[in-house]
UniProtKB/Swiss-Prot annotation:
The keyword Translocase applies. HAMAP family: NqrE. The keyword Magnesium does not apply. Keywords: Cell inner membrane, Cell membrane, Ion transport, Membrane, NAD, Sodium, Sodium transport, Translocase, Transmembrane, Transmembrane helix, Transport, Ubiquinone. It holds the Pfam family Rnf-Nqr. Residues 229-256 are annotated as: Disordered. It comes from the Bacteria. The chain crosses the membrane at residues 1-21, 50-70, 83-103, 123-143, 149-169, 189-209. NQR complex catalyzes the reduction of ubiquinone-1 to ubiquinol by two successive reactions, coupled with the transport of Na(+) ions from the cytoplasm to the periplasm. NqrA to NqrE are probably involved in the second step, the conversion of ubisemiquinone to ubiquinol. It is found in: Cell inner membrane. It comes from Chlamydia pneumoniae (Chlamydophila pneumoniae). Signal peptide: none annotated. It catalyses: a ubiquinone + n Na(+)(in) + NADH + H(+) = a ubiquinol + n Na(+)(out) + NAD(+). This is Na(+)-translocating NADH-quinone reductase subunit E.
Length: 256
């Protein structure tokens, strides 16, 4: 339930994969609107990225329990075995969005009290975290992959940190581009998309690293075992055929 067939090395692989290899923004293009709009300054991008990472991590963990004990197949058997046939999967998206919206509202109230400047700089994009497709997409990705709780929490953390890292990198580059001589036709969205593509290509350099699969499920393929058996059986048969002739030759040598 908590870790399943995953080892801690696999959990680290899930974190690495969610943050870099399958970045929720650069590989899946989720959350692009706030990514492009709030990346003009590093301070604003850092605050929004931190908020998205926090919301995605917490809501991903909460929604895992929702799926496991309320909306998933046979999820209500913990109440009574007779409820095994009841399936509340049609309510899953609604409950997920309600959980995300509720936690976003709590985060908005906390930021208004703790950091008024960050609250004002984020503006309308802070309450829009509730409908940010990166949040709901990250939760659904983890649920459809049937992660246990700890891998699900780490996946949500990695996806949120990957989005945070991407927007901070773009904001840093944009601050440098403000003092550069950019061609007129590429100013604004044009140079932002080009920069985003280059960042995505840099993240793709880690594609070959794949340690996120559960180690306990790694077994030899059936086809491979059949090939090995077929190649070893003729050797056994040939050795058994030649065994009588070899023993006969040995007895003749001894008699001589």
């Amino acid at each position: 339930m908590w870790l399943g067939a995953y080892t801690w090395l696999n959990v680290f692989g899930i974190l690495l994969q969610a943050a870099f290899i399958q970045n929720i923004l650069l590989a899946n293009f989720l959350g692009m609107c706030s990514y492009l709009a709030c990346s003009t300054r590093v301070s604003t991008a850092n605050g929004l990225g931190m908020s998205v990472a926090l919301v995605l991590t917490v809501t991903g963990s909460i929604n895992w329990f929702v799926h496991a004990f309320i909306t998933g197949p046979k999820a209500l058997t913990w109440i009574s075995p007779s409820l095994a046939s009841v399936n509340l999967g049609f309510l899953e998206l609604i409950i997920f969005i309600v959980v995300i919206a509720a936690f976003t509202q709590i985060l908005e109230l906390l930021l208004e009290k703790v950091s008024r400047n960050l609250y004002l700089s984020l503006g309308i994009f802070l309450p829009l975290i509730a409908v940010n497709c990166a949040i709901l997409g990250g939760v659904l990705f983890g649920i459809t992959r049937s992660y246990p709780f700890i891998p699900m929490m780490i996946f949500s953390l990695g996806a949120g940190c990957g989005w945070w890292l991407a927007i901070v990198i773009l904001a840093t580059i944009k601050e440098k581009l403000a003092y550069s001589d950019i061609p007129k036709n590429l100013q604004g969205m044009g140079i932002s998309f080009i920069t985003t593509g280059l960042i995505a290509m840099a993240f793709m350099s880690l594609t070959g690293i794949d340690i996120s699969k559960p180690s306990a499920k790694i077994q030899r393929a059936p086809l491979e075992t059949e090939v090995v058996e077929n190649t070893t059986n003729p050797l056994k048969e040939s050795s058994s055929k030649h065994q009588p002739s070899i023993s006969k030759a040995r007895t003749q040598r001894r008699s001589l």
